[in-house]
């Protein structure tokens, strides 16, 4: 075997070794890319979870911090509970075969996560009412945090106590998300549907509280 042949064989073997190393590196890069993608997905999921938890904590704090008289609390609670009952009733009307399996609004909220049929109906009802999931979170938080000390006022009783509940909400509720959700709850009950950018009415204190003669 001459030197040229030996050199050629050595060169081929060297090229094979280089090729094997390149293939190994390519495999490692693919594994790294896969690991990176997994880490990014986990990070994004974790970030969303933290953001959601932070928003829930902020909402809970905002609800607990409300300085309301018993009358004011009862009025806001009345709108909240009527909206939640309305939503639950509409779900049952569209899913009559699931009435026994959806005895409460909480059961609807749980089932919609895994049940597409319930989820589609729920989303359509929210759209019909002009509400979003964030509104439901706010209203449920209010119900859970303050409902145990509140009582329901009928529409007639509410009108006896206050003429413009919008004025009450915009002045007493400082958290914007909670304020917007409560305003939409009022719109759903009084007008049948909420407007995403409600027009905030300005009222004087004389307009807000009816006189004894009225």
Swiss-Prot record:
Keywords assigned: Coiled coil, Membrane, Transmembrane, Transmembrane helix
Primary location group: membrane
Coiled coil start-end: 6-42
Membrane keyword on record: yes
Signal sequence range: none
Gene Ontology CC annotations of this record: membrane
Matches recorded under InterPro entries: DUF4547 (IPR027875)
Membrane topology: Single-pass membrane protein
One Pfam family in the UniProt entry: DUF4547
Superkingdom of the organism of origin: Eukaryota
Subcellular location: Membrane
Ranges that cross the membrane: 65-81
Protein name: Single-pass membrane and coiled-coil domain-containing protein 1
Native source organism of the sequence: Homo sapiens
Lineage: Eukaryota, Metazoa, Chordata, Craniata, Vertebrata
């Amino acid at each position: 075997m001459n030197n040229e042949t030996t050199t050629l064989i050595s060169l081929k073997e060297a090229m094979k070794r280089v090729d094997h190393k390149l293939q190994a590196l390519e495999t490692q890069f693919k594994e790294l890319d896969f690991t990176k993608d997994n880490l990014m997905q986990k990070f994004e999921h974790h970030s969303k979870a933290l953001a959601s938890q932070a928003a829930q904590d902020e909402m809970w704090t905002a609800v607990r911090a409300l300085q309301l008289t018993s009358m004011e609390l009862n009025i806001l609670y009345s709108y909240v509970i009527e909206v939640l009952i309305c939503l639950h009733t509409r779900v049952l009307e569209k899913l009559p075969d699931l009435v026994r399996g959806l005895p409460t609004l909480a059961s609807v909220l749980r089932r919609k996560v895994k049940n597409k049929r319930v989820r589609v109906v729920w989303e359509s009802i929210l759209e019909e009412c002009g509400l979003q999931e964030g509104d439901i979170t706010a209203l449920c938080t209010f119900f859970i945090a303050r409902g145990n000390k509140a009582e329901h006022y009928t529409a007639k009783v509410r009108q006896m106590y206050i003429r413009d509940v919008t004025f009450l909400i915009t002045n007493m509720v400082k958290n914007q998300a909670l304020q917007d959700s409560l305003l939409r709850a009022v719109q759903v009950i009084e007008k049948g549907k909420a407007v995403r950018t409600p027009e905030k009415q300005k009222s004087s204190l004389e307009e807000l509280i009816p006189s004894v003669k009225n």
